[in-house]
Every structure is written in C-alpha cells, then in structure tokens.
C-alpha cells in the first residue's frame, strides 16, 4: 500500500488512511474494518479538520477493544512524542527504541542505530528550538504495529545549517505540521523499525522557504 503524505492534510483522506491501515493490520477488507471500527469510517464519521491549521483539541480517533499490550504501546508512544521528543530528553529515547533501530526518514534516507536517530532528530531543534508535538489525533495499533498521526508546532527562529557549512537566516515564522509515524515493535516493547512521513513542502511554505 502506498500512502501519499500530502493527503494527510485533508480530514477525509486522513480517516480513510486510518481505516486502510487498520484493515491491513487486521487482515480485513475495508468494509470489515469500517464495520469493526465505525469511528474510522469517513462515510459515517465527522471529517477531521486540516491538521496543519487546526487550533482546537481533537478527540483522538482510535480502534476500540484494545488489549493491555496495545494500550501500553500507544502510551509509550505518547510519552515519546509529548515528553521525550518535545523536551529533547535524548537520554530517554532508549525507553521506546531498540539500540539497533532502523528509521526511514521523510526524505527517503534511513539511519541505523539509536545514536544516529538521535543526531537526526537534533537537527530540527537547531533551527526551531521550540518544536513540540501537541496532539495525536489518530492512534492505530494491532499487535506489534502502530501508526500514529501527530500535530507538531515550532518557529523558524534560529539559522538553519546547510551541508556546505552555510546557513539560512531565520524568518521568525511559525509552522504547524501533520506527520505520521508507523512503527514495528519487538518483544521487549521497543521500536525496531520506524517510518516517518510528513509534508516537507507545507513546512517550507509556512516558514518562507518555498
């Protein structure tokens, strides 16, 4: 299945994507997934707003009847985004990620190992030190697989380093982004492989670089 991250900006597409992921994870058809999880059916539910502009708190859309293990994974991911990542508590990233974790980045690259992932995450805070995740409007889990849609905010307030050693001057403009993290967890409840999706073009437009 191919997921176009640009479609996450529209509420109907977001719900449909959540429904499709639930169907795949549970080995069901879309119709069966909609019947089992009516809150994910875009034809039966109120569409979510534009996640790149919404200012209100969204009641999370998630499957019902989760077992204790599935709830634990979602709780761990909430702590990861809201506290560890947003607070730059890098020494705690090992609470949710395996030492040899592979992370697939939005630009098509990937990193191997926990420390490499931490260094990649730190770059965001060099030019937007107030970056934080504020909501998880969609949370899906099935067994050892999770898919979570998040809303993040920040401000382009510091120079953005470039590979050639130069830097882009800050514009002082704020941004709000929607992103999706798909993760595969191991038997120790640690992420062993992670896929990150976000609309980079939308962020560039908001901070004045596109």
Please identify what each model-predicted range represents.
Residues 20, 113, 203:
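Short glycine-/acidic-enriched loop or helix-start segments at secondary-structure transitions
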Residues 76, 80, 120, 179-181:
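Alpha-helical packing segments of well-folded alpha/beta enzyme cores
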Residues 37-69, 125-210:
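A beta-strand edge to alpha-helix "cap/lid" segment located at domain peripheries
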Residues 4, 13-24, 30, 34-95, ...:
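Short, low-complexity N-terminal intrinsically disordered segments enriched in polar/charged residues
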Residues 74-75, 90-151, 155-158:
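A solvent-exposed, acidic/Ser-Thr-rich amphipathic alpha-helical stretch
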């Amino acid at each position: 299945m191919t997921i176009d991250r640009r479609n996450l900006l529209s509420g109907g597409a977001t719900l449909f994507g959540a429904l499709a992921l639930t169907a795949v994870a549970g080995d069901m058809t879309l119709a069966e997934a909609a019947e089992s999880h009516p809150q994910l059916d875009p034809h039966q539910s109120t569409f979510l707003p534009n996640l790149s502009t919404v200012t209100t708190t969204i009641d999370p859309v998630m499957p019902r009847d989760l077992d204790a293990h599935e709830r634990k994974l979602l709780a761990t991911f909430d702590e990861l985004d809201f506290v560890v990542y947003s607070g730059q508590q890098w020494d705690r990233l090992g609470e949710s990620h395996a030492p040899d974790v592979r992370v697939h980045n939005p630009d098509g690259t990937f990193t191997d190992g926990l420390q490499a992932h931490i260094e990649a995450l730190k770059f965001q805070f060099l030019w937007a030190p107030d970056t934080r995740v504020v909501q998880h409007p969609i949370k899906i889990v099935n067994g050892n697989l999770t898919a979570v849609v998040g809303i993040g905010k920040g401000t382009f307030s510091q120079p953005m380093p470039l590979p050639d050693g130069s830097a882009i001057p800050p514009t002082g403009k704020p941004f709000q982004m929607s992103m999706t993290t798909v993760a595969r967890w191991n038997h120790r409840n640690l992420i062993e492989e992670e896929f990150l999706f976000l609309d980079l073009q939308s962020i560039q437009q908001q901070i004045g670089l596109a």
